[in-house]
Amino acid sequence: MAVKIRLKRMGSKKSPFYRIVVADSRSPRDGRFIETVGTYNPLKDPAEVVLKEDLVLDWLSKGAQPSDTVRNILSKEGVMKKHHEAKNVKK
């Protein structure tokens, strides 16, 4: 099962609000998901991001692939850097 971390669109017409979710890559964009790991509101200035960092790092370490947009969000929040540092630590 290929697992992705991606955005699930919420909110009403013309006012999008997104949940950052972990989902099977075969399920639809707004369909079934495994776990919610954060939210993203692009309408606020600056965009509001709330992440459960420990859950995101856990899923990344298990092999979940972030979508391009989520990868950019995680990079801005510093999560990708922490993931790469944790991955490169010698055991």
UniProtKB/Swiss-Prot annotation:
Keywords: Ribonucleoprotein, Ribosomal protein. One of its GO terms (molecular function) is structural constituent of ribosome. Pfam families: Ribosomal_S16. GO terms for cellular component: cytoplasm; small ribosomal subunit. Coiled coil: none annotated. GO terms for biological process: translation. Gene3D superfamilies: 3.30.1320.10. PANTHER family: 30S RIBOSOMAL PROTEIN S16, SMALL RIBOSOMAL SUBUNIT PROTEIN BS16M. Belongs to the bacterial ribosomal protein bS16 family. NCBIfam families: S16. This is Small ribosomal subunit protein bS16.
